[in-house]
Protein backbone atom coordinates (compact mmCIF):
# COMPACT_ATOMS: atom_id res chain seq x y z
CA UNK A 1 0.00 0.00 0.00
CA UNK A 2 2.89 2.34 0.76
CA UNK A 3 4.39 1.81 -2.68
CA UNK A 4 0.98 2.35 -4.31
CA UNK A 5 0.65 5.70 -2.53
CA UNK A 6 4.21 6.64 -3.47
CA UNK A 7 3.88 5.66 -7.14
CA UNK A 8 0.20 5.16 -8.03
CA UNK A 9 0.92 4.94 -11.74
CA UNK A 10 3.20 1.92 -11.33
CA UNK A 11 1.78 -0.18 -8.49
CA UNK A 12 -1.44 -2.15 -8.99
CA UNK A 13 -2.97 -4.41 -6.34
CA UNK A 14 -5.55 -7.17 -6.78
CA UNK A 15 -7.92 -8.32 -4.08
CA UNK A 16 -7.25 -11.82 -2.76
CA UNK A 17 -9.31 -14.14 -0.60
CA UNK A 18 -7.55 -12.83 2.55
CA UNK A 19 -8.58 -9.23 1.82
CA UNK A 20 -11.71 -9.97 3.81
CA UNK A 21 -12.05 -8.80 7.40
CA UNK A 22 -13.68 -12.07 8.47
CA UNK A 23 -10.64 -13.99 7.20
CA UNK A 24 -8.27 -11.39 8.70
CA UNK A 25 -9.85 -11.94 12.10
CA UNK A 26 -8.98 -15.64 11.97
CA UNK A 27 -5.46 -15.22 10.58
CA UNK A 28 -4.11 -12.55 12.90
CA UNK A 29 -4.27 -9.28 10.97
CA UNK A 30 -6.95 -7.76 13.20
CA UNK A 31 -5.04 -8.85 16.32
CA UNK A 32 -1.91 -7.21 14.93
CA UNK A 33 -3.70 -3.90 14.46
CA UNK A 34 -5.17 -4.11 17.95
CA UNK A 35 -1.71 -4.83 19.42
CA UNK A 36 -0.24 -1.80 17.66
CA UNK A 37 -3.02 0.72 18.03
CA UNK A 38 -5.12 -0.74 20.88
CA UNK A 39 -8.90 -0.73 20.74
CA UNK A 40 -9.14 3.03 20.88
CA UNK A 41 -10.79 5.35 18.40
CA UNK A 42 -7.73 5.44 16.12
CA UNK A 43 -7.54 1.65 15.95
CA UNK A 44 -11.22 1.24 15.12
CA UNK A 45 -11.01 4.02 12.53
CA UNK A 46 -8.04 2.34 10.85
CA UNK A 47 -9.86 -1.00 10.75
CA UNK A 48 -12.84 0.66 9.08
CA UNK A 49 -10.61 2.31 6.46
CA UNK A 50 -8.83 -0.96 5.65
CA UNK A 51 -12.16 -2.78 5.48
CA UNK A 52 -13.34 -0.28 2.87
CA UNK A 53 -10.10 -0.45 0.90
CA UNK A 54 -10.33 -4.25 0.68
CA UNK A 55 -13.77 -3.99 -0.92
CA UNK A 56 -12.54 -1.45 -3.48
CA UNK A 57 -9.52 -3.39 -4.71
CA UNK A 58 -9.74 -4.61 -8.33
CA UNK A 59 -10.41 -8.31 -8.91
CA UNK A 60 -8.58 -8.73 -12.23
CA UNK A 61 -5.91 -6.87 -14.16
CA UNK A 62 -5.23 -7.41 -17.87
CA UNK A 63 -1.66 -6.74 -19.05
CA UNK A 64 -1.03 -5.69 -22.66
CA UNK A 65 -4.35 -7.22 -23.74
CA UNK A 66 -2.72 -10.64 -23.39
CA UNK A 67 -2.37 -11.70 -19.73
CA UNK A 68 -5.11 -11.82 -17.10
CA UNK A 69 -4.00 -11.59 -13.45
CA UNK A 70 -6.41 -12.81 -10.77
CA UNK A 71 -5.94 -14.16 -7.26
CA UNK A 72 -7.89 -17.43 -7.44
CA UNK A 73 -9.12 -18.19 -10.90
CA UNK A 74 -11.99 -18.34 -13.37
CA UNK A 75 -15.31 -20.15 -13.69
CA UNK A 76 -18.25 -20.64 -16.02
CA UNK A 77 -20.26 -18.09 -14.01
CA UNK A 78 -18.50 -14.99 -15.29
CA UNK A 79 -16.56 -13.25 -18.01
CA UNK A 80 -14.65 -10.01 -17.63
CA UNK A 81 -17.58 -7.82 -18.65
CA UNK A 82 -19.96 -9.34 -16.10
CA UNK A 83 -17.27 -8.98 -13.43
CA UNK A 84 -17.09 -5.24 -14.10
CA UNK A 85 -20.83 -4.92 -13.52
CA UNK A 86 -20.67 -6.13 -9.89
CA UNK A 87 -20.71 -3.46 -7.20
CA UNK A 88 -17.81 -5.01 -5.33
CA UNK A 89 -17.94 -2.30 -2.64
CA UNK A 90 -20.98 -4.11 -1.21
CA UNK A 91 -18.90 -7.22 -0.53
CA UNK A 92 -16.59 -6.25 2.31
CA UNK A 93 -16.70 -9.91 3.31
CA UNK A 94 -17.52 -13.03 1.32
CA UNK A 95 -17.13 -15.51 4.15
CA UNK A 96 -19.22 -13.62 6.70
CA UNK A 97 -22.49 -13.16 4.79
CA UNK A 98 -25.70 -14.84 6.03
CA UNK A 99 -26.86 -18.19 4.63
CA UNK A 100 -29.79 -16.45 2.96
CA UNK A 101 -27.19 -15.14 0.49
CA UNK A 102 -24.66 -17.97 0.42
CA UNK A 103 -27.02 -20.98 0.30
CA UNK A 104 -30.04 -19.77 -1.67
CA UNK A 105 -29.56 -19.46 -5.45
CA UNK A 106 -32.22 -16.74 -5.52
CA UNK A 107 -30.97 -15.09 -2.35
CA UNK A 108 -30.79 -11.30 -2.03
CA UNK A 109 -31.13 -8.75 0.76
CA UNK A 110 -32.02 -5.10 1.31
CA UNK A 111 -28.35 -4.06 1.21
CA UNK A 112 -27.96 -5.18 -2.41
CA UNK A 113 -26.15 -8.49 -1.88
CA UNK A 114 -27.20 -11.27 -4.26
CA UNK A 115 -26.26 -14.93 -4.35
CA UNK A 116 -25.27 -14.54 -8.00
CA UNK A 117 -22.71 -11.78 -7.39
CA UNK A 118 -21.43 -13.43 -4.21
CA UNK A 119 -20.81 -16.74 -6.01
CA UNK A 120 -18.98 -14.96 -8.85
CA UNK A 121 -16.65 -13.21 -6.40
CA UNK A 122 -16.06 -16.48 -4.52
CA UNK A 123 -15.09 -18.19 -7.78
CA UNK A 124 -12.75 -15.32 -8.66
CA UNK A 125 -10.95 -15.38 -5.29
CA UNK A 126 -11.16 -19.01 -4.11
CA UNK A 127 -10.89 -21.23 -7.23
CA UNK A 128 -8.04 -23.51 -8.35
CA UNK A 129 -7.03 -25.05 -11.70
CA UNK A 130 -7.83 -28.76 -11.74
CA UNK A 131 -4.99 -31.23 -12.34
CA UNK A 132 -5.18 -33.04 -15.68
CA UNK A 133 -6.11 -36.25 -13.86
CA UNK A 134 -9.24 -34.66 -12.34
CA UNK A 135 -12.50 -36.11 -13.66
CA UNK A 136 -15.53 -33.93 -14.40
CA UNK A 137 -19.05 -35.39 -14.57
CA UNK A 138 -20.80 -35.26 -17.94
CA UNK A 139 -19.89 -32.21 -19.99
CA UNK A 140 -19.07 -30.02 -17.00
CA UNK A 141 -15.83 -28.03 -17.16
CA UNK A 142 -16.10 -26.52 -13.66
CA UNK A 143 -17.14 -28.19 -10.43
CA UNK A 144 -17.35 -27.38 -6.74
CA UNK A 145 -14.01 -26.94 -4.97
CA UNK A 146 -14.95 -29.13 -2.02
CA UNK A 147 -11.49 -29.12 -0.42
CA UNK A 148 -11.59 -25.34 0.03
CA UNK A 149 -15.30 -25.10 0.67
CA UNK A 150 -15.60 -22.26 -1.86
CA UNK A 151 -14.90 -21.49 -5.50
CA UNK A 152 -14.49 -24.12 -8.21
CA UNK A 153 -12.01 -26.44 -9.83
CA UNK A 154 -11.84 -25.65 -13.54
CA UNK A 155 -10.62 -27.92 -16.31
CA UNK A 156 -7.89 -27.50 -18.91
CA UNK A 157 -10.53 -27.33 -21.63
CA UNK A 158 -12.27 -24.48 -19.83
CA UNK A 159 -8.97 -22.59 -19.61
CA UNK A 160 -8.63 -22.82 -23.41
CA UNK A 161 -12.20 -21.66 -23.97
CA UNK A 162 -12.10 -18.80 -21.45
CA UNK A 163 -8.82 -17.41 -22.77
CA UNK A 164 -10.02 -17.75 -26.37
CA UNK A 165 -13.28 -15.96 -25.52
CA UNK A 166 -11.30 -13.00 -24.15
CA UNK A 167 -8.56 -13.17 -26.80
CA UNK A 168 -5.92 -13.65 -24.09
CA UNK A 169 -2.74 -15.71 -24.06
CA UNK A 170 -2.49 -16.84 -20.45
CA UNK A 171 -3.76 -16.50 -16.89
CA UNK A 172 -1.56 -15.69 -13.87
CA UNK A 173 -2.92 -16.44 -10.40
CA UNK A 174 -1.63 -17.27 -6.91
CA UNK A 175 -3.71 -18.71 -4.04
CA UNK A 176 -1.65 -21.94 -3.70
CA UNK A 177 1.75 -22.23 -2.04
CA UNK A 178 4.33 -23.88 -4.36
CA UNK A 179 7.62 -25.51 -3.37
CA UNK A 180 9.51 -23.65 -6.11
CA UNK A 181 7.42 -20.49 -5.87
CA UNK A 182 5.56 -21.19 -9.11
CA UNK A 183 3.87 -23.92 -11.14
CA UNK A 184 2.46 -24.12 -14.66
CA UNK A 185 -0.86 -25.79 -15.44
CA UNK A 186 -2.98 -26.62 -18.45
CA UNK A 187 -0.20 -26.80 -21.05
CA UNK A 188 1.39 -23.59 -19.78
CA UNK A 189 -1.73 -21.45 -20.18
CA UNK A 190 -2.05 -20.99 -16.40
CA UNK A 191 0.78 -19.92 -14.09
CA UNK A 192 0.50 -20.10 -10.31
CA UNK A 193 2.86 -17.48 -8.86
CA UNK A 194 3.47 -17.48 -5.10
CA UNK A 195 5.82 -14.77 -3.89
CA UNK A 196 5.98 -15.48 -0.14
CA UNK A 197 8.92 -17.74 0.67
CA UNK A 198 8.83 -20.02 3.72
CA UNK A 199 5.11 -19.36 3.98
CA UNK A 200 4.48 -21.96 6.68
CA UNK A 201 7.59 -21.13 8.71
CA UNK A 202 10.32 -23.52 9.72
CA UNK A 203 8.12 -26.62 9.48
CA UNK A 204 7.73 -26.48 5.69
CA UNK A 205 10.02 -24.38 3.51
CA UNK A 206 9.21 -23.08 0.04
CA UNK A 207 10.77 -20.64 -2.41
CA UNK A 208 9.02 -17.46 -3.45
CA UNK A 209 8.85 -16.32 -7.07
CA UNK A 210 8.17 -13.20 -9.10
CA UNK A 211 7.62 -12.81 -12.83
CA UNK A 212 9.32 -10.02 -14.76
CA UNK A 213 7.51 -9.14 -18.00
CA UNK A 214 9.03 -6.97 -20.69
CA UNK A 215 8.42 -6.74 -24.46
CA UNK A 216 12.15 -6.07 -24.83
CA UNK A 217 13.05 -9.51 -23.42
CA UNK A 218 13.28 -12.72 -25.39
CA UNK A 219 11.33 -14.55 -24.12
CA UNK A 220 9.20 -11.67 -22.77
CA UNK A 221 8.72 -13.31 -19.34
CA UNK A 222 11.42 -14.21 -16.81
CA UNK A 223 10.79 -16.05 -13.53
CA UNK A 224 12.95 -15.17 -10.52
CA UNK A 225 12.89 -17.38 -7.42
CA UNK A 226 14.26 -16.65 -3.97
CA UNK A 227 14.10 -17.75 -0.35
CA UNK A 228 14.28 -15.91 2.96
CA UNK A 229 17.72 -16.27 4.52
CA UNK A 230 17.99 -17.05 8.20
CA UNK A 231 20.98 -16.43 10.43
CA UNK A 232 23.18 -19.35 11.47
CA UNK A 233 21.67 -21.11 14.43
CA UNK A 234 18.13 -21.21 13.06
CA UNK A 235 15.14 -18.97 13.47
CA UNK A 236 15.24 -15.97 15.73
CA UNK A 237 12.13 -15.81 17.85
CA UNK A 238 10.82 -12.25 17.97
CA UNK A 239 7.87 -10.70 19.72
CA UNK A 240 5.23 -9.09 17.50
CA UNK A 241 6.48 -5.57 18.17
CA UNK A 242 10.10 -6.54 17.43
CA UNK A 243 9.17 -8.33 14.23
CA UNK A 244 6.99 -5.46 13.04
CA UNK A 245 9.74 -2.97 13.82
CA UNK A 246 12.35 -4.82 11.76
CA UNK A 247 10.05 -5.38 8.78
CA UNK A 248 8.32 -2.03 8.69
CA UNK A 249 11.42 0.11 9.16
CA UNK A 250 12.95 -1.55 6.10
CA UNK A 251 9.74 -1.14 4.10
CA UNK A 252 9.34 2.51 5.07
CA UNK A 253 12.92 3.22 4.04
CA UNK A 254 12.14 1.90 0.56
CA UNK A 255 8.95 3.93 0.33
CA UNK A 256 10.83 7.08 1.36
CA UNK A 257 13.23 6.50 -1.53
CA UNK A 258 10.25 6.45 -3.91
CA UNK A 259 8.81 9.60 -2.38
Question: What does each of the following model-derived ranges do?
Answer:
Residues 1-259:
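Feature recognizes metal-dependent phosphohydrolase scaffolds
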Amino acid sequence: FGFAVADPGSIYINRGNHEDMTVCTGYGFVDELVNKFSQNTAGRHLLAIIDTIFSLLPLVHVIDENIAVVHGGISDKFDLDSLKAINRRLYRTLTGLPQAITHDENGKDDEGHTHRDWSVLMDCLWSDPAPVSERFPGELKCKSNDERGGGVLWSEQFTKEWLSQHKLGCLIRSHECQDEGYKTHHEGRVLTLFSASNYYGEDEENDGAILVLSPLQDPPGKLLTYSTCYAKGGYEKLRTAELAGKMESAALARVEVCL
